[in-house]
Amino acid sequence: MNNPLLAIQSQYWAVRDYLSPVLRESKFKEHGRITPEEFVAAGDFLTFKFPVWQWEKGESSRARDFLPPDKQYLVTRNVPCLRRATAVDYTNADEDAEKLLSFLDDAEEAPGPDDDWVATHINRSPPHRPTDMDEIPDIPDSPTTAPTREMAGLNVSSGGKLEEDEIPDIDDIPDMDEEGLEDLEDDAAVRIVHPSEAEVNSTAGKNLLQVRTYDCIISYDKHYQTPRFWLFGYDEHKNPLTPAQVFQDVPADHAFKTMTMESFPHSGAQLASVHPCKHASVMKKFIDRMEAAQGPAPTAEPETISSTSGTSGSAGGKEEKEKKKKWGLGSMVRKVTGGSVPKVEKDKDEVVTGVPVDFYLVIFLKFIASIVPTIEVDSTTSTAL
C-alpha cells in the first residue's frame, strides 16, 4: 500500500479540504449537503437514540475549529464482521438464482408487486452443513442382564447378625507410615501431554467462527460538506488488521475504488474510508424517496388568520376610525415591510414537513451498510423513518 501516487493524492485532498470554505447555509433538501451545525444535531440524535455511538474529541492539535471541541467525530467500537466479502459476492451466475417470496396468507387478497420479497443466492450451498457432521453413536445395551457370579453368590438373608465386638475401632487401624508402606505413583495417571503448536493451529479454524471486529467512525468532510465513514479493524486476537486484510471484508466492486486507505484527519492514522464524492447525490435521492412515500405535505390551517380577522372585525366603529386616521411612522414601516403580529404568530406555529435533518446520519448508515454488507454497521433497523 506504499503507493507514492496515493500519498500525493492524499496530500492534495488534505490541502483542498483545508482551503474549502465552511458551509453556512443549509442545503439538506436541495443538494443533500449539511452544515457543521446540522452534523452535530444529527450526531446528537444518533447518540441519543443509539448509545453505541459516542462523540469523540480526538487530538487537540488536530481539532476542527468549526466543530465543538468535544464533538469532533462519532465512533462505535467492536462492530462484528462474521464473514468475508467473498462469501456474499453477487456474480453473474447468481442473477438467475432469485425467487419471489410472498408472506401473505391464503385468506388474504392477492399480493401486489410491492408485497413480494426477493430471495437471492438460493442455489448456493452453505460452506458447512449440519448434515455433514458425524453422528454420535449410542452406547449399546448390555448383552445380558443376569447378575455376575460374585453377585449371585451373595445371600442377604443367610448371614447372622454382627455382634458389637466384631466391629473394629477406627483407632485400632494401623497407619500406613507405621507399617512402612510407601505410595506408588502411577506414571500413566500423572503424565500430561502438551499438544504442539501446529496441532493447535490446525484445529483452531475447523469448527470455530473467526470473528473480526471494527471501529466505525463518522467525521465531517468540509470540502464535500457531507459525513465521511472510516474503518479500523481487528482480528479475532484483537491485533490490528493490515490494509490487505481490511479489503477482504469489502466487496470487489468497492475495494480500491469507492473505499481506499486515507489519512484520518483527527489522528493521522491510515484508515479505510468510503470516499464522499457521491454522498450528497445519493442522500438527496434517499430523502426524495422518503418524502414521496410520506405523501403530500399538509396545508396550513387558516385558524390564526380567521381568528385575527374576527377579532379585528368585532372592534367598535370608533376604534376603526382611529386606526384609519392614525398613520404614524411605526404603522408605515409595518405596512411596507409586512411585519404584523398575526404573521409572526403564524411563523411560530409553522409545521416542518418532510424528513428532518436529525435523521440524516440514520439514513447515512443504511447507505453505508450497502457498501460493506459484511460489517454490522447499521444498528438502526428498528427505527421507523
Swiss-Prot record:
GO cellular component: cytosol; phagophore assembly site
Any single Pfam family the record assigns to this protein: Autophagy_act_C
Region of interest called Disordered, as start-end residue ranges on this chain: 126-169, 292-329
Domain comment quoted from the record: The N-terminal region is involved in phosphatidylethanolamine-binding and is required for ATG8-PE conjugation.
Subunit structure: Monomer. Interacts with ATG8 through an intermediate thioester bond through the C-terminal Gly of ATG8. Also interacts with the 40 amino acid C-terminal region of the E1-like ATG7 enzyme. Also interacts with the ATG12-ATG5 conjugate.
Taxonomic path: Eukaryota, Fungi, Dikarya, Basidiomycota, Agaricomycotina
Assigned protein family: Belongs to the ATG3 family.
Function: E2 conjugating enzyme required for the cytoplasm to vacuole transport (Cvt) and autophagy. Required for selective autophagic degradation of the nucleus (nucleophagy) as well as for mitophagy which contributes to regulate mitochondrial quantity and quality by eliminating the mitochondria to a basal level to fulfill cellular energy requirements and preventing excess ROS production. Responsible for the E2-like covalent binding of phosphatidylethanolamine to the C-terminal Gly of ATG8.
A GO biological-process term: autophagy of mitochondrion
UniProt-annotated catalytic positions: 277 (glycyl thioester intermediate)
Transmembrane segments: none
Stretch list, region Flexible region: 88-208
Region of interest called Handle region, as start-end residue ranges on this chain: 281-359
Keywords of the record: Autophagy, Cytoplasm, Protein transport, Transport, Ubl conjugation pathway
Major site of localization recorded for this protein: cytoplasm
Family matches, as InterPro entries: Atg3/Atg10 (IPR007135)
Protein name: Autophagy-related protein 3
Protein location: Cytoplasm
Keyword Membrane part of the UniProt annotation: no
Molecular function terms from GO: Atg8-family conjugating enzyme activity
Compositional bias per record (Low complexity), positions renumbered to this chain: 303-312
